[in-house]
């Protein structure tokens, strides 16, 4: 059975903000990504303290932006941050089964997907 992290949404958000401040200052993620940590998460399960919904853009890396290690974030990537029942199922799984107490929708600019969709809509008018 997976042990849930006992934290509050406020504490999880505080931890994300602190990690982001370290990222802005250092831009190097020194969190544990060792083989031992990977093995531990395989044996004992993942225990994320936050669910991050973010764009599919390969340049947006939540684990680095928030300076986290393996198993700390449950990241869901979707173009334009538009969720449907599949992403909602992942959110429910992370919150209900894994015990992640915080959901963050992380956007960025410019968003190519949104720009593309807007121009496709204009062309259809």
Descriptions of predicted regions:
Residues 2-82:
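Short, conserved "active-site rim" segments that organize catalytic pockets and cofactor/ligand binding
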Residues 65-69, 89-91, 117:
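Short, glycine/charged-enriched secondary-structure capping and boundary segments
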Residues 79-82, 108-112:
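Acidic, glycine-rich active-site loops and adjacent beta-strand->loop/helix elements
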Residues 83-98:
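Thiamine diphosphate
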Residues 101:
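Short acidic/polar active-site loop segments enriched in Thr and Asp
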Residues 105:
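Conserved functional hotspot residues or short segments at active or partner-binding sites
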Residues 114-121:
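Conserved small/polar residues in nucleotide/adenosyl-binding loops
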């Amino acid at each position: 059975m997976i042990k849930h992290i006992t934290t509050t949404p406020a504490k999880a958000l505080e931890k994300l903000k602190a990690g982001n401040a370290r990222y802005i200052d250092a831009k190097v993620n020194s969190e544990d990504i060792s083989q031992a940590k990977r093995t531990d998460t395989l044996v004992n399960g993942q225990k994320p303290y936050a669910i991050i919904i973010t764009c599919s853009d390969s340049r947006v890396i939540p684990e680095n932006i928030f300076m986290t290690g393996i198993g700390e974030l449950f990241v869901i990537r979707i173009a334009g941050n538009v969720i449907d029942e599949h992403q909602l199922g992942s959110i429910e799984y992370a919150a209900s089964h894994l015990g992640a107490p915080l959901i963050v929708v992380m956007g960025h600019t410019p968003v190519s997907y949104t720009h593309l969709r807007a121009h496709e809509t204009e062309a259809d008018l």
